[in-house]
């Protein structure tokens, strides 16, 4: 009975949020910019949440968590939905948890990026870790479910089709850009059957870093933006010219969202390639994004998944957390 009452309350909150957002309309792509429902340019700056299922298990998927993200200055949060976690907790329970999360995000004035968080080669169903295991059938099912469930939820503004495509990891098979482009277009077409308004985010290879193929063979669908994950060790310093050649040039024509950035010191918890750096990277990447009008979310608003933004569940900022909290709050106040 208590569960029924709770779900009725969640449904009521979501209905109210939907009514409010319907009056505002959807974020859309115009040229190389995101535009809010009032016609103003919108730059997304926010935080990557770890998997909703993980956070439920940790007892941290709650309003306090979302309120803290908003207090840091985020205007967007990213839900990293791992296929194996979705199946472990169950689709119904996971989506019910995300319903509540979307209501909290809307309450605190934040948009949501829905991220199908797998790493590897979707064409050949070969992945870098069992937690990312999925296939095309399940991927289409996920996006049908998202598009149907949230077709009246403009808070869920961005659909990140596939987290990190790669064919250079061990045993990840083969896939050309033309093949991957076609798969992404099929997923977008599936989404658009149920929700023609959502902006779809498309990534390139090399763990979603490389967007060079977009120069000659862009995604042939409207209302799309591109993703890159320019962690500090993807290229050696000086970074800017290489960033421009690898992904930044795309922002001259289409919106770009770097849905994962971040760093940690060499001696900090979880330090690994390609994230080891200092706040020198933080200064360079944020200055570059401002110059190019690139949106971003920082990985990861969690105590375990590195590079972490927080050291504990009192939300004590880590080294990168101190840098990005100050930066986000400054931008939010402008």
Residues covered by each model-derived region:
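Aromatic-lined substrate-binding rim segments of carbohydrate-active enzymes
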Residues: 61-123, 138-140, 180-195, 274-293
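Extracellular glycoside hydrolase catalytic/binding regions
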Residues: 26, 58, 137-158, 162-295, ...
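Acidic/histidine-rich helix-loop elements
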Residues: 42-64, 84-90, 127-131, 233-236, ...
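Feature marks short, surface-exposed loop/turn motifs that line or immediately flank catalytic pockets
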Residues: 51-53, 80-87, 120-122, 165, ...
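N-terminal carbohydrate-binding accessory modules
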Residues: 17-76, 205, 326-331
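Residues embedded in well-ordered beta-strands within globular domains across many folds
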Residues: 46-48, 78, 160, 201, ...
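Sec-dependent N-terminal signal peptides
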Residues: 4-14
């Amino acid at each position: 009975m208590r569960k029924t009452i709770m779900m009725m309350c969640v449904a009521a909150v979501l209905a109210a949020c939907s009514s409010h957002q319907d009056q505002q309309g959807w974020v859309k792509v115009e040229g190389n910019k995101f535009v809010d429902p009032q016609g103003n340019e919108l730059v997304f700056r926010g935080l990557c949440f770890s998997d909703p299922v993980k956070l439920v298990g940790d007892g941290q998927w709650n309003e306090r968590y979302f309120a803290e993200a908003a207090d840091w200055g985020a205007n967007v949060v990213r839900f990293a939905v791992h296929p194996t976690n979705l199946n472990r907790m169950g689709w119904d329970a996971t989506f019910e948890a995300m319903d509540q999360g979307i209501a909290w995000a809307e309450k605190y004035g934040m948009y949501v990026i829905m991220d199908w968080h797998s790493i590897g080669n979707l064409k050949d169903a070969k992945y870098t870790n069992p937690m990312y295991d999925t296939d095309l059938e399940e991927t289409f099912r996920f996006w049908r479910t998202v598009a149907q469930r949230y077709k009246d939820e403009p808070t869920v503004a961005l659909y990140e089709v596939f987290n990190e495509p790669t064919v250079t990891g061990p045993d990840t098979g083969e896939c050309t850009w033309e093949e991957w482009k076609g798969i992404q277009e099929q997923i977008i077409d599936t989404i658009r059957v149920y929700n023609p308004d959502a902006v779809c985010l498309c990534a390139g290879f090399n763990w979603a870093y490389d967007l060079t193929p977009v120069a000659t063979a862009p995604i042939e669908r409207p209302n799309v933006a591109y993703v890159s994950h320019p962690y500090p060790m993807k290229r050696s310093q000086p970074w800017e010219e290489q960033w421009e050649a690898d992904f930044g040039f795309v922002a001259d024509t289409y919106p770009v969202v770097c849905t994962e950035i971040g760093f940690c010191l060499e001696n900090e918890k979880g330090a690994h390639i390609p994230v080891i750096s200092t706040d020198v990277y933080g200064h360079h990447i944020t200055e570059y994004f401002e110059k190019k009008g690139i949106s971003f979310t920082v990985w990861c608003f969690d105590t375990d998944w590195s590079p972490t933004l927080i050291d504990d569940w009192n939300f004590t900022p880590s080294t990168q957390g101190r840098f990005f909290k100050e930066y986000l709050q400054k931008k939010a106040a402008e």
